[in-house]
Amino acid sequence: MSKPMDVEQEPKIDDALYSRQLYALSHETMKKITSTSVLVVGLQGLGIEIVKDLSLAGVKSVTLYDKELVEIKDLSSQFYFSPEQVGKVGRADACFQKVVDLNNYVRIDVHNGELSDEFLKKFNVVVLANQPLALQLKVNEFCHANKIHFISVETRGVFGQLFNDFGEQFTITDTNGENPNAYMISSISQDKEGIVTVVEEQKLQLLDGDLVTFKEVNGMSALNDLPPQKIKTISPLTFSIGDTTNLPPYTSGGYVTEVKQPKVVDFKPLKNILESGENIFITDDFKFTQPTNLLAGFQAIHKFAEKNKHMPRPHNKEDANAVIEIAKGLLKKPDDELDEKMITQLSFGAQGDIVPMQAILGGITAQEVLKACSGKFTPIHQLAFFDSVECLPEDLETLPEEEFQPIGSRYDGQIITFGKTLQNKIENLNYFLVGAGAIGCEMLKNFAMMGLGAGPKGLVHVTDMDTIEKSNLNRQFLFRSSDIQQLKSQTAANAVRVMNPDLNVKAYSLRVGPDTESHYNEEFFNSLDGVCNALDNVEARLYMDSQCVYYGKPLLESGTLGTKGNTQVVVPHLTESYSSSRDPPEKGIPVCTLHNFPNAIEHTIQWARDTFEGLFKNNADNVNSYLTNPAYVQSLKTQNPFVRLETLASIKASLMDRPLDFNQCIAWARLKFEEYFNNNIEQLLYNFPKDMVTTTGTPFWSGPKRAPTPLKFDVENPLHLEFIVAAANLRAFNYGIKAETNIEVIQKQAANVIVPDFTPKKVKIQTSENEPAPSSNTQQAGGDAEDDQCDTILSQLPQPSEMAGYKINSIQFEKDDDTNHHIDFITATSNLRATNYAISPADKHKTKGIAGKIIPALVTTTAVVAGFVCIELIKVIQNKALEKYKSTFMNLGIPFFGFVEPIAAPKNKIREGWTWTLWDRFDVDGDITLKEFLDLFEKKHGLDISMLSCKVTLLYALFTDKKTKEERLKMKISQLYETLSKKPLPKDKKYLLLEICCNDTETGDDVDVPSVRYKYN
């Protein structure tokens, strides 16, 4: 059985589909991936996770091999099986069609013959999932001898192991996937050391022995032609390249760029590793005995299974003791001690099958397959163990065996691992999933397999306001091409109902925020057991975090960036919240650098993006506001005069110089070329000539400042023409003029445009970030001249009534449509400006990534992160102690896994014996007068309130005059709020959140206290 497809010699990569993956991997890596054939043996939950991720990643072909009939227990984690297939259909055949539907570019086959040597030779990579050890050893021996990359992986309850054998002399072409470090040079000494100093804004991230190349160095220009040079680091800003005494002295400019070196690694067969205990990859630095014990433990359960024809029985102490005895004989060193508790846990759950572990091990394995076929990133070398014992029931050993026995349910794999009691709790949970994108799809799949919300009292709410785009299909696996433009939340909900028809799921398309609190109200939040964020923006994350703190709900938080991922669990009254610790804001590009002194392609791309926004969106929006909003002109008076003049001038130009046909759009584009890439550069050089020196005698054009060169328009230059084509077509769209894509027509018309000669102006140009911009000088001076010019323009503008119904089409930037000229314009504009400043240009792909702020994304990372989130969810359900929870920081590329205990909620002291955290508050139940409120806090809590507020409304203060104070003391808090805020209290809410400033009545000291939740309704 197979899916037919046309196989080309070099497969064409669908940039629109693989867009986010390409930013994590590169086109070169994708070419290798799309030429790779993979065999996956074992199609239960672990195997299907690997297959799903590889299919979405776009390998050439995946062959499925598993002739065993579907069992009911498989449905614990195999999301492409149905109850109707149990006992009737082979596993590979049962999931074939649904795997086919994942990606039209990937060939899917089912093999129902034998795993013969000739058959295995067809594949670049062979993966064995949850297979007997004897088969692992046999297939690995053949693969190693025949240079076929081999991976075996298995999960047993909360335990997992993964083994890689990529053969001898395996070449890693890129160990970490990061862009090579590049630095701007400040100076190079002419001596024996040859010390290179980079500009101060940067910090070296180079190590001794790294190789670097030079370019654009002036003076010591011979460095530009040298092969990669080995360096020795000296300080955070300097390194040595050796003797430069025979080279001319350095004068200016130049970049130094890290050269990535390939790394060659040898892999040994599985038999050797099991015998020697070598090449164990550590996954958790705090679990010192885990590798020793699980190396023996996994072999022991396989030996037990080989002898008894079944894995150890669930929670069976007799079987566990037998496994312990086998494991003792497998310890490598005389002083090794067996952790009998760990081996018992492994034996108890050896038949366990939980979707979080399948997601984690499956995602990691799929990433290892991609490493094997591409050489991109560092593989696990060679044997790795994983466990999540912290999520097992605390009293596991003392619970009765009956609690863990299968009941003929689709959740049997989970019951074997955690017991029936916990399974019942999971099914009756109410959870709110915020976001149905990549992580959201994985979470919904995990919820469906776990049965979360599938019980009579259970429910999953999911919201996402976005619709499905083609680029989503590569990693948001619940969507198909037929779903494009459909709502994500509803489509995802429909998809997981197919996976588990018992799942109770409600889909919404409302964003979360203050404006939707009438929907996501107190009743809604009070009905929840917890919230899971699957968001891609900090603002929404912070909002949901604040709501979870207010309502006292657990929050599961996560994020990904390429191969990197992180998770955080927020537990009421136990941990800090998401907003308690945040990353510093990203450093922006200084305005003067952007406008006048770019030195990197990122600067020119951002300038081009801003230019696009100004020309095709802001101008149109301003015109439309002028024509439709009577108060618009008045509102402009609040802006500084320089900005107001600029805005009015653009409105005048947009209305009075509006094009009537496409030829006029071409003429406008040609004049814009002259303005941006010739006149503005001529003006800059007029103000700051190339030979200019500063007051200290150093050249003005040095360090990060690169002297630009004006461009002379050449109608035969493809880049010049690309700008004209894109700019003219966007201008035409603004004005509703029919587009033109005939290059010859545009070329001919552009060549005939009459362009005025450049005349320099007397203007001040900002030269550093610390220097005030010209516009702020104007504002400080009063801006009288600008005011007069504004009045003149206003008198010349047509009245809105004269142009009733007229509108300019505003263009909203859309990065993922290759036909709309948006990225074409930004790429051409950026590269022309880069040419001005002798900066290496960027292709469309790189430009799109930077201009569109595209976050690199991989389905493998997403799957692993969602798995780790669900492990924490299982702990939350059991109310685990703080030390049992883990925040995860990982990078599948290096690879690295870090697990740390969440930070406890900080305690604030009011007085001896009385502390509070962000989770605490005062509760006042019932609407009372201000006097009663003040008395309550004085008598009950010993707090003398000096100030009371609600949001921005001050309700009470000690300094209020006596008469006003007496009037307010008699008023109820609700009445007081409505009177002072001039807003009615919402009828659908019950509470106000009040803030108080107060003193301790015993000591008179100011004290910090929690908020007050005041029930008025």
From Swiss-Prot:
Reactions this protein catalyses: ATP + ubiquitin + [E1 ubiquitin-activating enzyme]-L-cysteine = AMP + diphosphate + S-ubiquitinyl-[E1 ubiquitin-activating enzyme]-L-cysteine
Location of region: 2 approximate repeats: 26-571
Keyword Membrane on entry = no
- Residues annotated for ATP binding in this entry: 438, 464, 475, 488, 536-537
sequence repeat residue intervals: 26-163, 419-571
> What InterPro entries does the record tag this protein with?
E1_4HB (IPR032420), E1_FCCH (IPR032418), E1_FCCH_sf (IPR042302), ThiF/MoeB/HesA (IPR045886), ThiF_NAD_FAD-bd (IPR000594), Ub-activating_enz_E1_C (IPR018965), Ub-E1_IAD_1 (IPR042449), UBA_E1_C_sf (IPR038252)
Note the superkingdom of the native organism.
Answer: Eukaryota
Q: Which GO terms describe its cellular component?
A: centrosome; cytoplasm; nucleus
According to its UniProt record, this protein's enzyme class is: ligase
Give the EC number(s) listed in the UniProt record.
6.2.1.45
Any one Gene Ontology MF annotation carried by this entry is: ATP binding
**Known pathway:** Protein modification; protein ubiquitination
Q: Which family does it belong to?
A: Belongs to the ubiquitin-activating E1 family.
What is annotated about its quaternary structure and interactions? Answer: Monomer.
List the protein's name: Ubiquitin-like modifier-activating enzyme 1
Identify the species of origin.
Dictyostelium discoideum (Social amoeba)
Q: Which gene encodes it?
A: uba1
